[in-house]
UniProtKB/Swiss-Prot annotation:
InterPro entries: LolA/LolB/LppX, OM_lipoprot_LolB. Monomer. It is a lipid-anchor. It comes from Chromohalobacter salexigens (strain ATCC BAA-138 / DSM 3043 / CIP 106854 / NCIMB 13768 / 1H11). A lipid is attached at residue 31 (S-diacylglycerol cysteine). Belongs to the LolB family. It comes from the Bacteria. This is Outer-membrane lipoprotein LolB. A lipid is attached at residue 31 (N-palmitoyl cysteine).
Length: 214
């Protein structure tokens, strides 16, 4: 087991090998059982009506695809992300690397398992810094994929005609919400594009599921 300490959470992007590692850890499968409903019936007021519930939503799953593009090229992979109040499990599979990469986390401990072994750190940011030489604000992604800013603040938000988030800027990242889908009684982002310098990451959620928090 390899242990690393917690570094600064936002280091610079350096090479094509770096962005490949991004998907293995950052976006936390393509075998989703059903397609989401088309984004065609959002109304003004829907976002305000659900935002309080979104802010307290801490048990959900997301399955779909993630794509990355830098100056060096582009790739895509399948993603299966399960979030619980105190734990998360993110499985990345497909063309990235050989086989599967599994990221699991709980307070104070994050583990990444892939074909090269098992690696552990106190935070996902520290794990990325150790393995890739840079890191993302991973802890913020839990909020961004729900259409919310991370609670640390400093965000700038633009809304569309229906009052839903259209663009979010935070921690040097720009998150664009391109499409929405219905999950139970909530509207959830279906397609979002995140950019930071030369890095562009696109997440397409083929399936959202709201889970029991037990």
């Amino acid at each position: 087991m390899k242990h690393v300490s917690s570094p600064h959470p936002c280091a610079a992007i350096a090479s094509a090998r770096v962005w490949l590692g991004l998907v293995l850890v950052a976006l936390l499968a393509g075998c989703a059982s059903q397609a989401p409903s088309p984004d065609q019936s959002r109304d003004r007021g829907d976002w305000e009506a659900q935002i309080e519930r979104l802010q307290t939503l801490d048990a959900w799953s997301l399955a779909g695809k993630v794509g990355l593009r830098t100056n060096e090229g582009s790739e895509s992979a399948n993603i299966d992300w399960q979030q619980r109040p105190d734990t998360y499990r993110i499985l990345i599979s497909g063309p990235f690397g050989a086989g599967r990469t599994l990221l699991t986390g709980r307070p104070g401990a994050v583990t990444l398992t892939n074909g090269e072994g098992r690696f552990e750190a106190e935070t996902p940011e520290a794990l990325m810094e150790q393995q890739l030489g840079w890191s993302l604000p991973i802890s913020a992604l839990d909020y961004w994929v729900r259409g919310l800013p991370a609670p640390e603040g400093g965000e700038r938000i633009e809304h569309d005609e229906q009052g839903f988030p259209q663009q979010l800027r935070q921690f040097g990242w720009t998150i664009e919400y391109r499409d929405w889908t219905r999950a139970d009684t909530l509207w959830m982002p279906r397609r979002l594009v995140m950019t930071y310098g030369e890095l562009r990451a696109t997440l397409v959620a083929n399936q959202w599921q709201l889970l029991s928090d037990t």
